Amino acid sequence: MRRIVLFAAAALLAVSTSAQARDTRLELSLQELLSSQEARDAGIDGSVRFYLAGQPVRVAQRMGEDVTNKKTNAANKSDEQACRWVALSALKALQSGAQARGANAVVDIVSFYKRNEFRSSTNYECYAGTILAGVALKGTYARVN
């Protein structure tokens, strides 16, 4: 009887640990994404330029800050595919916000997943799970020269 109880407890422990949510962190190149056919297909048209924090840019006028927090279905996609797709959604939202304000760029972009800043002059941060992938970006709308 004791063996059965121990076996049942071990089985429950194994099931409960495998049921925990996956949250895999990826860093991916923003420039590679922006220059892809995927970006053009998603409507990233070049009318608004994107600059990660740390990239050199001459700002003529700052026009306010914004945060976008996008999620996408990650089922049946690789982590990288899901992250690229959701990053394009976040960039599209920033592009629309910039156009509405008369800005031609979004500068000082940082990843802002769960309100934690990640700064890189080359990469954005994405978190991929079993069901969802998410990208949060914070940036400043601007007119640049």
Segments from the language model and where they lie:
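N-terminal signal peptide c-region/cleavage motif recognized by signal peptidases
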Residues: 14-18
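Short, well-ordered alpha-helical segments
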Residues: 64-117
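Surface-exposed short loop/turn segments
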Residues: 108-145
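N-terminal secretory signal peptides
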Residues: 20-72
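Sec-dependent signal peptide recognition
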Residues: 2-8
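Extracellular/periplasmic catalytic domains that process cell-envelope and extracellular macromolecules
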Residues: 58-59, 99-100, 129-132
